[in-house]
Amino acid sequence: MPGDCLVFPGCRVTPDDPRYPTLIRGFNQRWVGHPRSVEVVGDARQIVEVVQRCVDDRLRLTVRSGGHCYEGWVSLNDGVIVDVSSLRGAGRDPETGWYFLESGCTNWDLYNQLYRQYGVTLPAGSCYSVGAGGHICGGGYGLLSRRDGLTVDWLHGVEVVCVDQDRRARLVTVTKDSPTAAEQDLFWAHTGGGGGNFGVITKYLFRELPRAPSEAWLASIAWEWSDLIAHQDLFFRLLDNYGRFFESNSAPGSPYSDLFSLLHLTRQAAGQVVLTVQNAGSDRRPLDDFLAAMESGVDKARMRSVAPRVAVGWHHYIPATTSARRMPWLEATQALNGSGANQRGKYKSAYMKAAFPAAQMDAIWKWLTIENDRYPANGQALLQVDSYGCRINAVAPDATAVPQRSSILKLQYQTYWTEPEQDRVNLDWIGDFYEAMYGPAGPRPDEVLDGCYVNYCDSDLVDWQHLYYKENYPRLQKAKREWDPHDVFHHHQSVQAGP
């Protein structure tokens, strides 16, 4: 029967259920599979049962939390999607004093509950509907990461359903202090190894968490593309100013650690380039210093900053003003915590350890302004450049599975559209832009670049093992051999056990 319940509150949603068309879709509408069922689970015990049934019946399974996987890793045919989005508990264990987050929590769930109940937070992402299940284990970051590091830098333990050598599904809890090397490998693999590799995460554990700011300063300003087209040198000046500021102010302990910015380099059709900045805390000076640095050398007679009117993808801005606003931190977080419409999309990423070289700035200009039959105008395409570094870079590259610990900027290439007929032109634009920036091998680590971000997964990458994980990949392979010997959990770019 449709909606045939397994054990309340979990239920099985099959193709004849009216919920099925919704539950087989995620954020990226390019990926729609046709699984035998979607198992909406309500607790860890149910997950063990579902995983065991899939193993016994030789059915492939995938896991969905918030549904924000950029590629089609979760969508599948003739298998089972384990939907953990109902596991949304967040709290503090009265016996251990540890904080916990269940894997179905969204970013907004964790911000809201941790702040209201305990006055703490996690340096997680700016999209409210992203699920903790995939976000944290991929090394999630956000607007407090320069201040507090990555989500995984606070992780102390993980509860996960694995399948052992005897093909038995079981719930295990491992921590940073687990007694065996194998258990420590499994814990470490969840500090940036990414989702869909080792098991079904049910809960994250944190011995301590950073205190949340009480307030924050926000500013959002824009520059008109019409001015930039007329004065190309000013575009290069803004881009260089941005890179140089963070090249000089991203070391651990920097007085600008509380400052985080998002530069939305939209395509020309969007009308504006938009900059959003947050400074956590009551001190406005770091924000003012940064904004002054951004417009250093900019001839305001030729180009003036204006109030933004453009929102791209899920990224919001503070509208209708060019002035900084002081507000309670949770309110500021909510103001920037957009999600946007579910559309078709494609994404790519790169870490940078230095400001933009001249050749890259030339490529950025070309691919943001190009409009022709092959690359038609799209106001929903952009290169987003996030600030990075500071507390993130205080951690050794092998202390977690995230090896990029010397970067100052994190780039996300994005394009959104609605109709399948538009797939080819959008994929061509983003793919050709990316190759113009880095060549066919992608952003291989060197003195300027440092690979790619596993949570912005990209099926086009050939040497993804090195671009995501660098020298940390062999230890991930070891954890795979130990904890998923039958490769139950796999996808196009999942960790391979190897020899």
Model-derived regions, located:
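Cofactor-binding catalytic cores of oxidoreductases
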Residues: G10-G26, G66, E71-W73, W217-P499
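Conserved, mostly hydrophobic/aromatic
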Residues: C54, Q165, D484
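Glycine-/small-residue-rich beta-strand-loop submotif within the FAD-binding core of flavoenzymes
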Residues: R45, S75-C105, L143, R147-D148, ...
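Glycine-rich N-terminal segment of FAD-binding domains in flavoprotein oxidoreductases
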Residues: D17-P18, N28-L87
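General beta-strand structural signal in soluble alpha/beta enzymes
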Residues: V13-P15, V40, L61-S65, V82, ...
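FAD-binding subdomain of flavoenzyme oxidoreductases
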Residues: A124, S129-A230
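Short, structural beta-strand-to-alpha-helix junction motif
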Residues: Q46, G97, L101, C105-N112, ...
